[in-house]
């Protein structure tokens, strides 16, 4: 722990040279510090040059407790884990969680290396009841994860978050299974989706998937939404990374809104990402 704290102080001294490392997390102006941290990273490494720096979102509420989210360059999302009596307090608390994770992300142990990949694959095998042989088989979920990590060698886990979230969502809504049935390899799927960001276009396509599921299993969207909201709240209160749970909530909310406003909605628009487009790529 002492070594980790010393490493964090060293990182703060490098990225925020005019800040006192001992006072960083006690500074009430943590919102500006988080912004300064990522601006400094962009200047030093040209990281995420085409993206905004830090984006905040406050949930509408008539009164406390208030909830605020902050999304970092690369896609990682964090929220306030404390019970906050004002929107400003919630925003500061979310920024503090994000800053701590941003600093930890600079540690060597958070960079994707061969050793990191080996440890991550072993953890994935343990959590899926698979075997290490699965890591060499790209048709398995562990193999796909292994391939994604190797394709992003040298990046940090926060830089890897956007692509990871996309594949978590594709697995969650059944798209990966559907793509396997069309004979698309995991490598082709990864190469295809690596070109895209998780934006409104992709959310609309995934919402359409759930609209179709609702027709086969009435009530499944509201059931999944309740689960996603519970997962999001539990993860936020635990100070965990939230992007996957938050995107699930956004996609399901969009699907439910469309179902309620137009029960006959079923046709995708031409500009939406679709399985057909990927099969054409294949």
UniProtKB/Swiss-Prot annotation:
It comes from the Eukaryota. InterPro entries: Autophagy-related_EPG5, LIX1. The gene is LIX1. This is Protein limb expression 1 homolog. The lineage of its organism: Eukaryota, Metazoa, Chordata, Craniata, Vertebrata. Belongs to the LIX1 family. One of its GO terms (cellular component) is cytoplasm. One of its GO terms (biological process) is autophagosome maturation.
């Amino acid at each position: 722990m002492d070594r980790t704290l010393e490493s964090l102080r060293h990182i703060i001294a490098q990225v925020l040279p005019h800040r006192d490392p001992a006072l960083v997390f006690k500074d009430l102006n943590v919102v500006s510090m988080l912004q300064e941290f990522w601006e400094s990273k962009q200047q030093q490494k040209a990281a995420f040059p085409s993206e905004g720096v830090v984006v905040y979102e406050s949930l509408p509420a008539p009164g406390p407790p208030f909830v605020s989210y902050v999304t970092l360059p690369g896609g990682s999302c964090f929220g306030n884990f404390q019970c906050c009596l004002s929107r400003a307090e919630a925003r500061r608390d979310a920024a503090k969680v994000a800053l701590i994770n941003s600093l930890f992300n600079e540690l060597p142990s958070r960079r994707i290396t061969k050793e990191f990949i080996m440890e991550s694959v072993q953890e994935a095998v343990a959590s899926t009841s698979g075997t290490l042989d699965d890591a060499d088989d790209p048709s398995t979920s562990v193999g796909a994860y292994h391939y994604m990590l190797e394709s992003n060698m040298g990046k940090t886990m926060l830089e890897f978050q956007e692509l990871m979230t996309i594949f978590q969502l594709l697995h969650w809504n059944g798209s990966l299974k559907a793509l396997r049935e069309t004979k698309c390899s995991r490598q082709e799927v990864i190469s295809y989706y690596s070109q895209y960001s998780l934006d409104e276009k992709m959310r609309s396509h995934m919402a359409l998937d759930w609209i179709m599921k609702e027709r086969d299993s009435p009530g499944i969207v509201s059931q999944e939404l309740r689960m996603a909201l519970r997962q999001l709240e539990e993860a936020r209160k635990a100070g965990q990374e939230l992007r996957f749970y938050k995107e699930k909530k956004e996609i399901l909310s969009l699907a439910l809104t469309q179902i309620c406003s137009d029960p006959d909605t079923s046709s995708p628009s031409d500009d939406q990402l679709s399985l057909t487009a990927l099969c054409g790529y294949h």
